[in-house]
Curated annotation (Swiss-Prot):
MF term (GO), any: damaged DNA binding
Compartment(s): Nucleus; Chromosome; Cytoplasm, Cytoskeleton, Microtubule organizing center, Centrosome; Cytoplasm, Cytoskeleton, Spindle pole
Record organism: Homo sapiens
PANTHER family named in the record: AURORA KINASE A AND NINEIN-INTERACTING PROTEIN (PTHR14526:SF2)
Modified residues (Phosphoserine): 267, 292
Residue ranges of the region described as Interaction with RBBP8/CtIP: 281-357
Protein name: Aurora kinase A- and ninein-interacting protein
């Protein structure tokens, strides 16, 4: 007999076939090149493949990042990739042509003196994108020194026909208006400067003519007949005879005054030198004194204030002998120079100099 009970109990896991059929099983693996997107329920998955072409097709130049990526809505075929790349390249070519036509319509409207060269800051890649050929660049290089404006205009004219609708864009219109207004302002300033210069020259000429008139006037006054000048000379000769006598008397009086002033100025100098010697002796007498044994010692006059004796040029009388200031100075040093104030006795009875702190 078969024993099914213990074997079924040993497994412990019961599998329902109907539940397994209902569950969805992932049959295909996720490719590493696909991009995972979080989709809401009801949305479809977008099959976007970011694959880079290793070998680009001949005759197609890679100009943008969009040429690296191809959008594959359905099947992945070589024909689909070519169609997508050609579509992106055609869009890029259209944009470059539009830019070239806008430049072609903008530049003829500008003034000749305010135009700046657009090719001065452009690179070779930008020129190639604009549809310019290298031959036209070479011709512009040869004729740049002679006629730069005409060659640059010829360079910026593309092979495509002109679009009348693009030339009247608001951006281009405002750009040309701003440039024209700036050019008009520059011209007005130049005219104003030239007018100022003309006025300045006109005024300088007037001033020069007026100066010439003023210089000619004194010359006309001096031109007088000879008869009058002779008469005036005779009269002036009589006056000149009396003039030397007056000059001599004036000179003598002036010399006498100078001699007296010199004599008066010399006398105080000698007095001043004698007073200086006396002041020196008085200053020595104030600095030094004699002790009880007759020896010369330094005089310590601590109680008396400091006095500037050198500036007092007359010690006996002073500049004002009757003034109280001179009397105080005469009495001051004699009263302060006393032996009791200068000397004292120590513990052994010896006489020593008094030190007051």
């Amino acid at each position: 007999m078969r024993r099914t009970g213990p074997e079924e109990e040993a497994c412990g896991v019961w599998l329902d076939a109907a539940a397994l059929k209902r569950r969805k099983v992932q049959t295909h693996l996720i490719k590493p090149g696909t991009k995972m997107l979080t989709l809401l329920p009801g949305e479809r998955k977008a099959n976007i493949y970011f694959t880079q072409r290793r070998a680009p097709s001949t005759g197609i130049h890679q100009r943008s990042i969009a040429s690296f990526f191809t959008l594959q809505p359905g099947k992945t075929n070589g024909s689909d990739q070519k169609s997508v790349s050609s579509h992106t390249e055609s869009q890029i070519n259209k944009e470059s042509k539009k830019n070239a036509t806008q430049l072609d319509h903008l530049i003829p409207g500008l003034a000749h003196d305010c135009m700046a060269s657009p090719l001065a800051t452009s690179t070779t890649a930008d020129i190639q994108e604009a549809g310019l050929s290298p031959q036209s660049l070479q011709t512009s290089g040869h004729h740049r020194m002679k006629t730069p404006f005409s060659t640059e205009l010829s360079l910026l004219q593309p092979d495509t026909p002109d679009c009348a609708g693009d030339s009247h864009t608001p951006l281009a219109f405002s750009f040309t208006e701003d440039l024209e207004s700036s050019c008009l302002l520059d011209r007005k300033e130049e005219k104003g400067d030239s007018a100022r210069k003309w006025e300045w020259l006109h005024e300088s000429k007037k001033n020069y003519q007026s100066m010439e008139k003023h210089t000619k006037l004194p010359g006309d006054k001096c031109c007088q007949p000879l008869g009058k000048t002779k008469l005036e000379r005779k009269v002036s000769a009589k006056e000149n005879r009396q003039a030397p006598v007056l000059l001599q008397t004036y000179r003598e009086s002036w010399n006498g005054e100078n001699i007296e002033s010199v004599k008066q100025s010399r006398s105080p100098v000698s007095v001043f030198s004698w007073d200086n010697e006396k002041n020196d002796k008085d200053s020595w007498s104030q600095l030094f004194t004699e002790d009880s044994q007759g020896q010369r010692v330094i005089a310590h006059n601590t109680r008396a204030p400091f006095q500037d004796v050198t500036n007092n040029w007359n010690w006996d009388l002073g500049p004002f002998p009757n003034s109280p200031w001179a009397q105080c100075q005469e009495d001051g040093p004699t009263q302060n120079l006393k032996p009791d104030l200068l000397f004292t006795q120590d513990s052994e009875g010896n006489q020593v100099i008094r030190h007051q702190f």
